[in-house]
Amino acid sequence: AEDRKSLSGLTEQEAQEFGTLYTQGVAFVAVIAVVAHALVWAWRPWLQ
């Protein structure tokens, strides 16, 4: 198998690892945002 660098400078394995971490990070931030919105909605509802 070729271990040639891509345009990003990452190997396929490194790109897979980065993609996994990036996806987990985005999901974590999304969960925090949903929880924050739920707490604010419970405190002071909007769009009644």
From Swiss-Prot:
**Domain of life of the source:** Bacteria
Q: Where in the cell is it found?
A: Cell inner membrane
Those parts of the protein on the Periplasmic side are 44-48
Sites binding a bacteriochlorophyll sit at H37
Q: How does it sit in the membrane?
A: Single-pass type II membrane protein
Which keywords appear in this protein's UniProt record, sorted alphabetically? Antenna complex, Bacteriochlorophyll, Cell inner membrane, Cell membrane, Chlorophyll, Chromophore, Light-harvesting polypeptide, Magnesium, Membrane, Metal-binding, Transmembrane, Transmembrane helix
For this chain's UniProt record, which GO biological process terms are given?
photosynthesis, light reaction
Under the heading Pfam families, the entry gives: LHC
Give the matching InterPro entries: Antenna_a/b, Antenna_beta_CS, Antenna_beta_dom_sf, LHB-1/5, Light-harvesting_complex
Q: Which GO terms describe its cellular component?
A: plasma membrane; plasma membrane light-harvesting complex
Membrane-spanning intervals of the chain? 21-43
Select a single GO molecular function from the record's annotations and give it. bacteriochlorophyll binding
| Quaternary structure (record) | The core complex is formed by different alpha and beta chains, binding bacteriochlorophyll molecules, and arranged most probably in tetrameric structures disposed around the reaction center. The non-pigmented gamma chains may constitute additional components.
Protein family per UniProt = Belongs to the antenna complex beta subunit family.
Q: What does this protein do?
A: Antenna complexes are light-harvesting systems, which transfer the excitation energy to the reaction centers.
The identity of this protein, by name, is: Light-harvesting polypeptide B-885 beta-1 chain
